[in-house]
């Protein structure tokens, strides 16, 4: 992607991955109501410009809707799976204060994030074998340089048990 436009660093993977807001699974929709002018909505505008891309990257299951110039004061509304709505007033807050506030009320705890990362690393460890939904590889024959499965490619006769038993019987 070309590095053109307003603040193109926002579109790099490093920047997108550096966001620290990971919502709980119960958050389904996030709406941001803000104005494009006025001093009171400056934090909300910066939040939309700098932090919304990071939140979208870290939370792909959350639908994010932006409403411009439809409200006298900026606010965020979260729709939860249970049907509840959480309303957050962001009128006089800076973008970092907004991020910290929503991280505190609707974000996952640090311990939970660490546990999920550890589980993900264990699940996709290259030394684990099993069904695809649990492991990276189903069989040892998928590792490059290993002997293929006898069901797919017949083994050389020197590697079969019958041949070795026949050799021992003959000598």
Swiss-Prot record:
One of its GO terms (molecular function) is structural constituent of ribosome. Coiled coil: none annotated. Keywords: Mitochondrion, Ribonucleoprotein, Ribosomal protein. It is found in: Mitochondrion. It comes from the Eukaryota. InterPro entries: Ribosomal_mL43/mS25/NADH_DH, Ribosomal_mS25/mL61, Thioredoxin-like_sf. SMART domains: L51_S25_CI-B8. GO terms for cellular component: mitochondrial small ribosomal subunit; mitochondrion. SUPFAM superfamilies: Thioredoxin-like. Belongs to the mitochondrion-specific ribosomal protein mS25 family. Component of the mitochondrial ribosome small subunit (28S) which comprises a 12S rRNA and about 30 distinct proteins. This is Small ribosomal subunit protein mS25.
């Amino acid at each position: 992607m070309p590095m053109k436009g307003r603040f193109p660093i926002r579109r790099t993977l490093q920047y997108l991955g550096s966001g620290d807001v990971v919502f709980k699974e119960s958050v389904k929709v996030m709406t941001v109501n803000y104005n494009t002018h006025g001093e009171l909505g400056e934090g909300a505008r910066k939040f939309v410009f700098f932090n919304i891309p990071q939140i979208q990257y870290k939370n792909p299951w959350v639908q994010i809707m932006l409403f411009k110039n439809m409200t006298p004061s900026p606010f965020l509304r979260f729709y939860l799976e249970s049907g509840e709505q959480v309303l957050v007033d962001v009128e006089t807050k800076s973008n970092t204060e907004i991020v910290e506030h929503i991280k505190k009320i609707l974000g996952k705890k640090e311990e939970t994030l660490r546990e999920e990362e550890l589980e993900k690393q264990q699940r996709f460890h290259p030394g684990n074998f099993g069904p695809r939904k649990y492991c990276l590889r189903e069989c040892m024959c998928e590792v490059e340089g290993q002997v293929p499965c006898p069901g797919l490619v017949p083994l050389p006769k020197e590697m079969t048990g019958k041949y070795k038993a026949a050799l021992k019987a003959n000598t």
